[in-house]
Amino acid sequence: PTPIGNLQEMTPRALDILKEVSVIAAEDTRNTKKLLIAYGIDTMLMSHHEHNQQVSIPKIIERLENGEDVAVVSDAGYPLVSDPGQKLVQETILHGFNVVSVSGANAAMNALVASGLSCYHYLFYGFLDNKSSKRKKQLEEIKTIPYTTIFYEAPHRIEDTLQDMLEVLGNRQMCLARELTKVHEEYIRGTIEEVLEVASTCKGEMVIVMDGFKKEEVVFDMYTAITKVDEYVESGMRTKEAIGLVAKEMACKKNELYEAYHKR
């Protein structure tokens, strides 16, 4: 792993490995070159990323077959964790070569332990889809998971993503961590609505740490749900839309509510 913001995050072991291997396969050789120059390392670099892996993987395997050692790095943090590298690891193992991981910086873990939310059980999700409709569907799939969930997000999408989270997950507790280990490192803690109030001013790479689903958040009974559907219908909403909205609000199954509503 390479630094996520602070150059001193490079461990002595990681530096030794970068010095000792025959070649370093880098997501962006320009970024990695700056890191190597800072530490006086002159190991050969080769490009390996999502768009050239069909060519780069066979070259790396060939080097391994010739008895060489190869290090794989991403631009920041761990390779494979929301970064390229999985196919290379799989191919390396299939060809009978050993793969080891080196400890280092990770934005998700930094954000989690400083979030104030539970660290006992957690889910790392990474990036949600950049389209709202698909993003909401992804959130629907995990909204009843009771564990703290960690997402990565880009600054230009942060408001839209938080709005979708508010709509699907409800107004949960969360922490927005940005610019981790850099000069302007910041943790914004509160409900989704509270964080949304300042999200438009936030810049830099971001980590969202979201509280897990809590059963006590939803006190569900079918009578209340049907009553709420009636209220929405009386206000002018179509029945199907009202049932869908109430099902989301009360975390119940839409088909069960639909059946109960029309059988009453």
Residue ranges and their predicted role:
Residues E65-Y125, D129:
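Short glycine-cluster motifs
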